[in-house]
């Protein structure tokens, strides 16, 4: 999503022109007075840029309580109002020379046009030449909160010059910051002001001097320098990024990103954005010639964009590339916005959707970005992939088909030599990651193959006011064409054209009961929703089928009602099982909000499930626990709204076979005044293969408003299993009408080896003028769920519905 544009200021040493820049978050003016410093004047015309351009061709209208003088030198007294186009001039007295066009206005002078609103002691000028001089003024920008005062201002058309003036977005009664300059030129036509020999004051203390400083007076963008970003780290040394914004056209722009790192050298980068009626896109590239630490050239390219072909089809692409496997860790910082990842995904495709169908043709490739891993950790590339999904009702029946054809490729894997510590504890040394060595020893040769997957089905969805009954019969056919290298890779049998076909039968049925009840004086609608799901799939030996993109689903409440345990088409489990589940809800009758919901369910296995993914040579596929005749783990989901501020949720899985819990999750959230929030969560997962603890974590985060101006933020994310913190954040925020200051201290796990790193982030926001320092919003939004209150109401993509971007019939309930 394209961000809004804003202006940033410059450092002491550079005289510059500042354009508007993309902002991650709109300025919060909530602490400002509800009225403008200078409210609009009664009778003044609305702001109209077109009227401003035609101002001199329009007639002048003058009215007042009394009129005296002659026809050539009239004098108006009392509630005088002069109007022409977008101009308004109000005063107690006005003398006019109709032959020359000169005028003098005195007493309670008020002036307004498309850009400015001001009050003054006196105004004089010439209407014919559209020149004016206003003295002893207080002003406000019409389209922004910018305001200030000046000894005088000279106006000519849409250009003006203020003398001995100030500029701020603060309320005049509390000017926390302001720019003071002997001259400020204002160009309403171009949409910016220029201050010469300007001084930025915080309170009454001067803190920065600007020989030449430009700032916006409306929302138009301007070419120039953005405020630099800088930091200090052990990896890069002193790090300085100076963005240069280029406003090339109304629908495209660019930002040059020169960056200096004292330990590495100069990096050159650029960002280009474009927008047109049928689409938009953004490309970013970086190049570091001869990195002094790595002794080689390094770089990256990122692109994302889309084009609407027509109302049914859209082309989309997302391309990512880095020069080496250490690039992400070396250059991960708030300076370029990259995040840590073990791989990067690139996709290019065209996608279509209609009333009864979805389709797509795309290509996908993965790149390794973690130097501690080899290529075996990468998923298969899909080059290309085509899918088509269709479903349509026919009377009481519904028929459909899910189809996919894919060509899979994979780069060969080469052995990565891990560090061999010579002394105890050396493996945990901060710089020991440099000792990982990528060798020329191939440890796995990958072949390629193609797969066709077809799944036609017919169902009969029947329902009434209190029940539903849906039998479904499907047939799944999957065929492969493998090259000889892959076909001969164990445990495959050497068959280059294996296939699998089998029927899938299911019955999904449920009832709905409700009753009206009351509890503690509140009326509720209480529901009881039992549900049954029977699934039968005969066994087919699939050991001769490769595993390309198939993984076991994480067992959850939603998994109780799927017709397969796997995400892809390489495996289709056999099944003779019955799911029994029930949900109960308590809904407040006055507003329909859910007070409490409880769901519980279990699968009864009438026979062993013999199909597994454990014999795969694809390391990414993982492994799974075999399914024996008996019962699955109990799955319980609960959500409870204690009140409008406090909510709790829990997920619990109890395995009757091992008599142990497989999963436990507890989370609670409390909403404070002034958009504050407190989150607390506990997560536990057991490794079902060896019964060890796979994950045991506690997570506490908060945004705590101390008062309307001060707030504290923090996160403590701890691994109980490893007995070490994963991330610690502490910070404070101070906010006012026109100034915000944020400071954070962060300690976090840096890489897969568990090495820790520290960072300090400080950000100053002069609202409506500038923002400098490091972007704290990105860090806090990721770490504290609800840091932006609107994030709490975002609905994540469902894993039980078809997404036109990602065919997978296994995700269809």
From Swiss-Prot:
GO terms for biological process: Gram-negative-bacterium-type cell outer membrane assembly; lipopolysaccharide transport. GO terms for cellular component: cell outer membrane; transporter complex. The keyword Signal applies. It is found in: Cell outer membrane. Keywords: Cell outer membrane, Membrane, Signal. Residues 1-22 form the signal peptide. Gene3D superfamilies: Lipopolysaccharide (LPS) transport protein A like domain. InterPro entries: LipoPS_assembly_LptD, LptD, LptD_C, OstA-like_N. Transmembrane segments: none annotated. HAMAP family: LPS_assembly_LptD. This is LPS-assembly protein LptD. It comes from Xanthomonas oryzae pv. oryzae (strain KACC10331 / KXO85).
